[in-house]
């Protein structure tokens, strides 16, 4: 594969991972908020209590998702930057050892000895640091994920996912709130299950059924709990 094609594939894979994470974040928003509003609506018919409970859950969930994503990506970025610093130090202190290290990495990644030697020689004529970090650690050199971008994306995806259950539980009349919300959430879960399976190249039917089952179980449990504490 040419260097240009490899770069295109890497960029596409990165965008695909971001999109998949967005779909999963939206899925979390759908299930989490559906569970909260169904449970509260089962316990009380007071629309303001239902709305405030759902709104608080949206804020808590979105900030929790964003905070977790920020910490996770920041840790990953720190680890990747430390790996780059180590390889840079190796290049500065012992060029021959760095060459042997890159050659061994190519061999480990499936190249034959001749090809590994050619690739090593070529890398040290161009950008040895880039080759070292990409081959040894699988890191895209100078393409570190921004933790703020990841956090904002996670916040938005969770918020968007929370809209179907939140809107349906507040818009529909009292007698239709719960069944309408279950129906709308079910459709939304089927869509996110289908989308995540397509992005991951997995069987769509299995993913859709699994996603729907988890959502229905969540809503069923919170509905029963709401009935126990009905006011």
Residue spans of the language-model regions?
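Core segments of transmembrane alpha-helices
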Residues: 29-34, 154-165
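The feature identifies polytopic integral membrane transport proteins across all domains of life
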Residues: 14-25, 47-54, 115, 147-152, ...
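Cytosol/matrix-facing amphipathic helices and coiled-coil assembly/linker segments
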Residues: 2-14, 73-155
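Structural signature of hydrophobic alpha-helical transmembrane segments
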Residues: 175-187
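Internal alpha-helical transmembrane segments
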Residues: 1-72
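Helix-coil boundary and interhelical linker segments in multi-pass alpha-helical membrane proteins
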Residues: 38-53, 166-177, 224-231
């Amino acid at each position: 594969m040419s260097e240009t094609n490899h770069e295109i594939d890497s960029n596409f894979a990165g965008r695909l991972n971001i999109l998949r994470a967005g779909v999963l974040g939206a899925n979390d928003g759908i299930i989490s908020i559906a569970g909260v509003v169904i449970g509260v609506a089962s316990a009380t018919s007071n629309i303001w209590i239902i709305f405030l409970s759902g709104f608080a859950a949206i804020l808590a969930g979105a900030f929790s998702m964003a905070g977790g994503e920020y910490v996770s990506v920041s840790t990953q970025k720190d680890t990747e930057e430390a790996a780059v610093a180590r390889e840079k130090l190796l290049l500065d202190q012992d060029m021959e050892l760095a060459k042997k290290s890159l050659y061994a990495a190519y061999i480990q990644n499936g190249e034959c000895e001749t090809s590994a030697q050619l690739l090593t020689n070529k890398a040290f004529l161009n950008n040895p640091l880039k080759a070292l970090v990409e081959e040894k650690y699988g890191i895209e050199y100078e393409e570190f994920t921004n933790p703020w971008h990841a956090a904002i994306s996670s916040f938005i995806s969770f918020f968007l996912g929370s809209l179907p259950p939140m809107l349906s539980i507040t818009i529909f009349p009292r007698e239709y709130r719960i069944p309408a919300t279950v129906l709308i959430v079910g459709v939304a879960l089927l869509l996110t299950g289908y989308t995540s399976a397509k992005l991951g190249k997995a069987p769509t039917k299995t993913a859709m059924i699994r996603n729907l089952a988890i959502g229905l179980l969540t809503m069923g449990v919170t509905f029963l709990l709401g009935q126990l504490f009905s006011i």
